[in-house]
């Protein structure tokens, strides 16, 4: 994974190997974007990124749309730099899909951003969140699930 904010000890504890963005570009069969929206990641996935790919991976964008230059992604799909894409977000949060160049392509799947939501998933998400808070307040740090940024004991 490439995450400049994930402390290496936390990555190791959850069996994640941190690598550079260049390593991702050269080695990945699938690239899954989960970036938060910040000025630093605006158009992170651009022509330079896609042109640096070595393996024609599948590209998944489940983050905010601003991190992907959609014109560059379209060029990467057309040139074969990206073999396929799964998209549930666009730069425009309410896109007009009647004129969207990704619609109708054999190598693109578009889903609504809320694709996983169900009554069961909301309940599970709430239970995990409350459980994490309780474990944290009791200083049971090893019991906290889905740590993104490490917890200092």
What do these predicted regions represent?
Residues 2:
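The conserved SAM/SAH-binding core of class I Rossmann-like methyltransferase domains
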Residues 5-100:
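Rossmann-like adenosine-cofactor binding region
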Residues 56-153:
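Rossmann-like dinucleotide-binding domain for NAD(H)/NADP(H)
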